[in-house]
């Protein structure tokens, strides 16, 4: 038993005690290549708007909890009716998006810069399909562009009132004088 423990002590000292380390370069160019500065928090206060699919107050609680776990978040506002989440703080946009997606919610950056002014009917609010698909944020998998547009007929942005569609070529019952 003494000889076996002696051999195991020697093998431990030779092989496992000093792990293999990366070689240190003395050249400045190699140091700059291998040692980059860690990413710090953004220098300015940022406001990040997200469009998150939420159906109840439980979903709202899950989203808030996931965002408040991030370092640098000052405040989180959730508008459940519009499915909009506004985050204010010293945090990066992609980290917030990734945290919400890890919580199990479908999320994307808010595609509408301000309240829409050109829609005339409440059925068409927030249905602008021109900017829904963003390839760089993996919206094909996580976004809203898969099931919404399947089988739906395209509705023009002119609205449902009769006066705006009176001379429209797409309207079957339009004026035939033109």
From Swiss-Prot:
PROSITE patterns: HMA_2. CDD domains: HMA. Keywords: Lipoprotein, Metal-binding, Methylation, Prenylation. Coiled coil: none annotated. The modification Cysteine methyl ester is found at residue 175. Residues 45-108 form the HMA domain. It comes from the Eukaryota. A lipid is attached at residue 175 (S-farnesyl cysteine). Disulfide bonds: none annotated. GO terms for molecular function: metal ion binding. A metal cation binds at residues 56, 59. Residues 176-178 form a propeptide. Heavy-metal-binding protein. This is Heavy metal-associated isoprenylated plant protein 30. It comes from Arabidopsis thaliana. The gene is HIPP30.
């Amino acid at each position: 038993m003494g000889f076996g423990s002696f051999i195991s002590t020697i093998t431990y000292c030779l092989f496992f005690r000093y792990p293999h380390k990366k070689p240190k370069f003395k050249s400045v160019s190699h140091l700059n290549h291998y040692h980059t500065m860690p990413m710090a928090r953004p220098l300015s206060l940022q406001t990040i708007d997200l469009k998150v699919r939420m159906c109840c107050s439980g979903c709202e609680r899950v989203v808030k909890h996931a965002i408040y776990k991030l370092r640098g978040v000052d405040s989180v506002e959730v508008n459940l009716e519009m499915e909009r989440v506004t985050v204010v703080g010293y945090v990066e946009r992609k980290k917030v998006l990734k945290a919400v997606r890890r919580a199990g919610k479908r999320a994307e950056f808010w595609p509408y810069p301000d309240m829409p002014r050109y829609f005339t009917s409440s059925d068409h609010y927030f249905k602008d399909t021109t900017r829904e698909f963003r390839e760089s944020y993996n919206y094909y998998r996580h976004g809203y562009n898969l099931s919404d547009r399947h089988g739906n007929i395209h509705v023009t942005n002119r609205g449902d009132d009769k006066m705006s569609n009176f001379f429209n070529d797409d309207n079957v019952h339009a004026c035939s004088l033109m």
